[in-house]
Amino acid sequence: MGEDTDTRKINHSFLRDHSYVTEADIISTVEFNHTGELLATGDKGGRVVIFQREPESKNAPHSQGEYDVYSTFQSHEPEFDYLKSLEIEEKINKIKWLPQQNAAHSLLSTNDKTIKLWKITERDKRPEGYNLKDEEGKLKDLSTVTSLQVPVLKPMDLMVEVSPRRIFANGHTYHINSISVNSDCETYMSADDLRINLWHLAITDRSFNIVDIKPANMEDLTEVITASEFHPHHCNLFVYSSSKGSLRLCDMRAAALCDKHSKLFEEPEDPSNRSFFSEIISSVSDVKFSHSGRYMLTRDYLTVKVWDLNMEARPIETYQVHDYLRSKLCSLYENDCIFDKFECAWNGSDSVIMTGAYNNFFRMFDRNTKRDVTLEASRESSKPRAVLKPRRVCVGGKRRRDDISVDSLDFTKKILHTAWHPAENIIAIAATNNLYIFQDKVNSDMH
């Protein structure tokens, strides 16, 4: 499918670039909450930064998509496993928001080994006028208390407090690659290379192992778990992907240990395309259920695929993300780029999908019109409120003035982490150590 430069359906403008500096500031995950009012990022330094959407102003109607820093906190610290003599990085692998139950917000964050539940609350009033305590909280001399007064709440500057509520540790031998909150709002699962555990949000010292693909002899190991997610509506269903390119849909009602899947989604390999790199590039790096729950979106190295839950034999749609790299696989293997794990995302109506690429490019595919576009998230190409120009990669021969050659792509600039607002056409793109937020100029055009 060739790229279409007509972007009336996919037309985003740049809102803001939140810029960082050091290695520790490289963004490792991006996640909107269920309303889209909050956006959380995690970085390699173990920090979580939460952005809040600005309320729309009559004086500045363009500010409705603006996100400003709401709170920043240190989620994880570097640790050392003395039993295995291994350092445990503080890098945040995933963040997942819990559905909001009250005025407070809650999120889960995880590094390679430990998952933490955080509560985010606001305070804009403080109590004053205690009878037995002074303003600093110290007990008064009772002889000075001559009258009884009713304490009152006085307004104060807004204060955002983040507090750790639970720490879920010692559940994984291998590195955690994904966490997913169940639709029952009481449980969540965490997956590492070989096992998936089910946790209750209120219980930290016990989890149930629901998938275990570790062979008796590790020499017989042929695949690992790469990602997992709960179904958005059916709390008994979940899917996990593997390094062999397969998806397994499991039903927790069938058995306590879901080693026997309910459905296996796998595309037969085309023998004509078989090469040394076939298995590496077929490894699924991300899997996402559609909001409707009818479809699954997967990302492998060169493509994004849409699967229908009712059809296991092959995907119903396949989109080429950067097929021009097929001839470059040898050099991408040598510089380890072939092992990069790109994420993918649905828009709110499941009609457009998005994923990242190299050179700070990201791709969007409209499932209805079959249009696709390549856009760039970079300071050079993005000025606040400017409309993004579609980019085009040229493989050889004649090229237009704005085209970029495959040989001049920068493989150190990669967009691995993306997120889409659950209801509106606002997207968040993590480009190494910069966060870009884009908003559709013509709202509802893609819906």
From Swiss-Prot:
Single Gene Ontology MF annotation = protein phosphatase regulator activity
Spans of the WD repeats are: 22-61, 87-128, 171-209, 220-260, 279-317, 334-375, 410-446
Superkingdom, natural source: Eukaryota
Of the GO CC terms on this record, one is: protein phosphatase type 2A complex
Q: Which UniProt keywords apply?
A: Repeat, WD repeat
The record ties this protein, via InterPro entries, to: PP2A_PR55, PP2A_PR55_CS, WD40/YVTN_repeat-like_dom_sf, WD40_repeat_dom_sf, WD40_rpt
Q: Which family does it belong to?
A: Belongs to the phosphatase 2A regulatory subunit B family.
| Primary role | The B regulatory subunit might modulate substrate selectivity and catalytic activity, and might also direct the localization of the catalytic enzyme to a particular subcellular compartment.
Subunit structure, briefly?
A: PP2A consists of a common heterodimeric core enzyme, composed of a 36 kDa catalytic subunit (subunit C) and a 65 kDa constant regulatory subunit (PR65 or subunit A), that associates with a variety of regulatory subunits. Proteins that associate with the core dimer include three families of regulatory subunits B (the R2/B/PR55/B55, R3/B''/PR72/PR130/PR59 and R5/B'/B56 families), the 48 kDa variable regulatory subunit, viral proteins, and cell signaling molecules. Interacts with IER5.
Which protein, by its recorded name, is this? Serine/threonine-protein phosphatase 2A 55 kDa regulatory subunit B gamma isoform
Q: Which gene encodes it?
A: PPP2R2C
